[in-house]
Design a protein with these regions (language model features):
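Single conserved hydrophobic/aromatic residue that forms the stacking wall/gate
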Residues: 1-5, 9-10
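Short, structured coil/loop segments at alpha-helix boundaries
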Residues: 6-7, 34-35, 58-66, 154, ...
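Glycine-rich phosphate-binding segment of PLP-dependent enzymes
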Residues: 13-22, 32-80
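A short N-terminal interaction module
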Residues: 24-28
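Conserved PLP-enzyme active-site core in the AAT-like
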Residues: 71-243
Length: 243
């Protein structure tokens, strides 16, 4: 019996749901949506445009979007205890691209964890860092502690005086020694960015580290990993200059 295309799509969609209902997936970049979130994602809003910001849309008829987005912004500011939140990104990588666009210019120097040491691919020359045309310098790595070598990284930041200092990884076991490294970055005039995509739920729950209180000027993240929501991303800052 040959299934037509639509039937095959429905079958595979149902099979995917069964897989997650009857197993415990351990993929860090995935999670399970609540029935309430599924209801919102399956609504008519899912297929509508809502370009712009609440109250300043390019399309008419976006009042429902405005209400929902304003609630989301207020909730994000409350959960992460920050002055600014943008929840429009379609992923953590898109949030990183937006942050790099705002905080750097082509040719600027950025420091980050190498992909070999657990850094996210968007932090690499082949990812968002390269798309922005930045000069990448990676941190010396402490293999035993599985974190940036603090003393060597402090020297690297002071010697290179990067425009932007980036922390956060897609593979890591422990909080980043952020406060000390951020202090050194600010001493040389660098902005500090923290990619919290893979640990954002732990940060929100107060059981990891608190990047915005430990020196990060901007924190990005995903809304669908340890923070269990639909596919999307965050831009967060406690800076009074964030808009």
């Amino acid at each position: 019996y040959r299934l037509v295309g639509s039937e095959m799509c429905i079958r595979d969609s149902d099979d995917s749901g069964n897989h997650y209902r009857h197993s415990i997936p351990m993929i860090a970049s995935e999670n399970i949506l609540s029935p309430l979130v599924r209801r919102a994602c399956d609504s008519d809003l899912h297929g509508r445009y809502a370009e712009g910001l609440p109250g300043k849309r390019y399309y008419q008829g976006c009042d429902d979007f405005d209400t929902i987005e304003e609630i989301g912004i207020k909730s994000a500011r409350r959960v992460f205890n920050c002055n600014f939140a943008n929840i429009q990104s379609t992923s953590g990588t898109v949030s990183n691209i937006a942050a790099l666009k705002a905080l750097s210019n082509p040719g600027d120097t950025i420091t980050a964890v190498s992909t070999a040491d657990g850094g996210h691919i968007s932090h690499a020359r082949m990812g968002a860092v390269g798309v922005r045309g930045l000069n990448l310098v990676t941190y010396p790595w402490d293999e035993e502690r599985m974190e940036p070598d603090i003393d060597a990284s402090l020297s690297l930041i002071r010697d290179n005086e990067p425009n932007l200092v980036l922390f956060g990884q897609s593979v890591f076991l422990f909080p980043t020694p952020l406060r000390e490294l951020s202090d050194a970055a600010h001493e040389v005039g660098s902005m500090v960015m923290y990619d919290g995509a893979h640990v954002l739920g732990l940060i929100a729950g107060g059981v990891f580290q608190d990047p915005l209180r430990e020196g990060a000027d901007v924190m990005t993240g995903s809304s669908h990993k340890t923070f269990p929501g639909p596919q999307g991303g965050f831009l967060l800052s406690d800076s009074e200059d964030a808009t």
